[in-house]
Amino acid sequence: MLSIPSLHLTRRCVLACGLAALLAACGTPADAPAMRLGQAESLQLRSWVPNGLRAQLQLMPVTGGQPTGRFWGAKISNSSLQEALEESLRDTGLYAPRPAEARYELRVNLVQLDQPMVAVLDAKVAVTLSYTVVESRGGRTVYERKLRTLHTTEFGSAMLDPNERMRMASEAAIRSNLNTLLRELLELKWPE
């Protein structure tokens, strides 16, 4: 039989575990700085930017994102994806400082975000983004592609919080997607 002090201790432990579970279940939105390209990647890509594309991309408003729920999940909002894209374009030298003078418009749509309902162990996230680059004057499509990238965040990265693992996997999948987009754009022939 439990004594009165151990009964109080047991109640406190149960209460503490319940509170920890509630806190771990809070939604964790993706963070724009974590989705943008790293400094080393940006510097490397910056050196490959052709003159015809340097400071010539205007980023249009991003679509398809979703706000993160209050209690569960790790979604990607339009505003955080917009910020990550804008900073990545700026860091690589593609972003047009004066949008009215940009030769091209970049249109981005978050088509699909595949996440597990609950990341029991590793969090495996796949993201599909649709990219379209059109001429600002004339509207001719220069580049159009759907890119799907996948990232897995291991259990040890955030053992107590499955939403944190999903957030980290989502951010890394977006970062990989942006890297692929920029590398493909730099390989195209651009008029000077």
Residues covered by each model-derived region:
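A structural "domain/chain start" motif
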Residues: L2-L7, C26-E83, L186-E192
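Surface-exposed short loop/turn segments
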Residues: G27-L37, T92-E144, H151-E164
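Short secondary-structure boundary motifs at beta->alpha junctions and helix caps
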Residues: P67-I76, G138-E184, P191
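Structured segments of extracytoplasmic/periplasmic soluble domains
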Residues: A84-Y95, T180, E184-P191
